A protein has these predicted regions:
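Ribokinase/PfkB-type carbohydrate-kinase core domain
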Residues: 6-146
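Conserved phosphate-binding/catalytic region of the ribokinase-like
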Residues: 55, 61-65, 85, 110-210
Length: 210
């Protein structure tokens, strides 16, 4: 569960309790539930618990043995500070698609410069999607850098879930074999929907928006 305070400008402060998420263990990960899908999506939050971390590593091994894509989100700035070295090893060895906001990616490569963070993303030789709030997002794939414009909304009501819905829209595009620019546009559409109202669940079927 999560207690969220939302300001008038839509920014929010969260106090998160992971609850049952901390009880996930390797025994809960069944190959047949994973290999029937195209992409696995892992949350950095789960690195806060050793059992959950081992469960995610088991999922990574299953995906790699089945040649599945693995997506990973850095989740939170403080999460990066706690697990930077573990994340570094995971990113460099196992991940195909990385999601982060601007502050998280800068923290991961320990720089205050966004340009240097983009250079770091280029060096990873994978797809890296970096969200930048009202400045849209940047998708990096090796030396290719694609700037994605934000989808405008009448009013930003609540930014809770914006990063999650961005990832959902992006991965929807990847699963549909769309080019990275289109994936980024889908991501922006999904994020725009979620920030236009209170709560982190969409009020419409997202596939109807793209």
């Amino acid at each position: 569960c999560c207690t969220i305070f939302v300001e008038d400008d839509g920014t929010r402060t969260m106090c998160t309790f992971l609850g049952a998420g901390t009880l996930i263990s390797p025994e809960d990960i069944h190959p047949e539930h994973i290999t029937s899908h195209k992409i696995a999506y892992l949350e950095g939050y789960l690195w806060d618990n050793q059992n959950a971390k081992m469960a995610m590593k088991k999922m990574v091994d299953i995906c790699k043995s089945d040649n599945q894509q693995i997506a990973f989100t850095l989740s939170d700035l403080f999460c990066v500070d706690r697990h930077r070295e573990s994340f570094k090893e995971l990113i460099e060895n196992d991940i195909d698609i990385l999601f982060a906001n601007e502050d998280e990616i800068k923290a991961q490569c320990q720089t205050d410069s966004f340009d240097k963070a983009v250079d770091y993303a280029k060096s990873l030789n994978m797809i890296v999607a970096i969200t930048r709030s009202e400045n849209g997002s940047v998708v990096v794939n090796k030396n290719e850098v694609i700037e994605i414009n934000p989808v405008q909304v009448d009013r930003v009501v609540d930014t809770t879930g914006a990063g999650d819905l961005y990832a959902a829209g992006f991965l929807f595009g990847v699963a549909k074999n769309k080019d990275l620019s289109t994936c980024g546009h889908y991501a922006s559409i999904a994020a725009a929907e979620i920030i236009s109202h209170y709560g982190a669940r969409p009020l419409v079927k997202l596939s109807n928006l793209v």
